[in-house]
């Protein structure tokens, strides 16, 4: 399949995924709090516009923002660019390498009847590939008129992977809960691009909604609903809009987490008087209890291989993170101290958690920990599928906002909303095949 056809197909799939949703009144937007001066410099040249009117969206600006958000790159400001080439043949390598910039992205956007044709080239300016001026990566593809941002994120993914050997995650989504300032249904589960654009309402309710969690194929969300004045777990099909209640036991039902193969959901329930971890087989509805005892056990999260579950427990007097196998045996302490809301990266290398009031990363091989945030009352960390970025909620003033931090701590930003408090962010899996 040609890449242009692939990208068009991808757009149709992503659009149909959210076809049952309603576009939200306002969108979250990234506000940079801390930059990446120590990251790898790169130049994203403003793309040439081959239309008679003005370019609807600055493609180069989106690519620059994506690469900056990863914490791996520090795009040079347009005002400091020594030249503004539009093709690889126009790139003068020496003027870029003298600035310490070893890679330059150039491109063009051409409007057509169906949308836009976007072309780019990634140029090596120091000869790391063998020849200075060599094109490391290039592509040309077509996008519908309302998917130009998807085209830009696609370029970002390709450039990021070429330069880091790590798959890009700029075409992923985030789900979260918004509590609006007024209205008959102020609680909403929403989905947006990872950077806050193209926001949609998945479901609205007059009662609280909590803890959205993605299925591994990105087709469903599980979340907590307090409709009918009781907590219940819902699985929501994002394409059809169908909602299925999977747990409505007496007491609290919360913290759903899909297994890596999508066949099971781990959750916490106090149906027997004490909060414990359970696993439900989604095929036949059978439930297994994994924890027991006097302490409260909650916030289950699966290991990437699906062979173990980490969870938060106060069995020792305060919240700590433990790990057990999928039948509840072999319980071990993962992180001592006041730690909770643990998540393991997709490659199994790091644990991200709340420690005290902040986001902390723990290297699971070395045991070394690093504080990534300095915000207030941090909650609900979620890791991008490539392990490069972390999204979480924090308190700002009297409300809750989303925060983005790169896994190395270099880049920090806020995603505030203008129409309510934002909580419980959940990063999607990859939604495209490559």
Swiss-Prot record:
Cleaved signal peptide residues: 1-24
Database matches in PANTHER family: PROTEIN TOLB (PTHR36842:SF1), PROTEIN TOLB HOMOLOG (PTHR36842)
InterPro entries to which the protein is assigned, alphabetical: 6-blade_b-propeller_TolB-like, PD40, Tol-Pal_TolB, TolB_N
NCBIfam families per the UniProt record, alphabetical: propeller_TolB
Stated role: Part of the Tol-Pal system, which plays a role in outer membrane invagination during cell division and is important for maintaining outer membrane integrity.
Protein name from the UniProt record: Tol-Pal system protein TolB
Keyword terms of this UniProt record: Cell cycle, Cell division, Periplasm, Signal
Quaternary structure (record): The Tol-Pal system is composed of five core proteins: the inner membrane proteins TolA, TolQ and TolR, the periplasmic protein TolB and the outer membrane protein Pal. They form a network linking the inner and outer membranes and the peptidoglycan layer.
Keyword Cell cycle belongs to the record: yes
Entry's family note: Belongs to the TolB family.
Any GO BP: cell division
GO CC list: periplasmic space
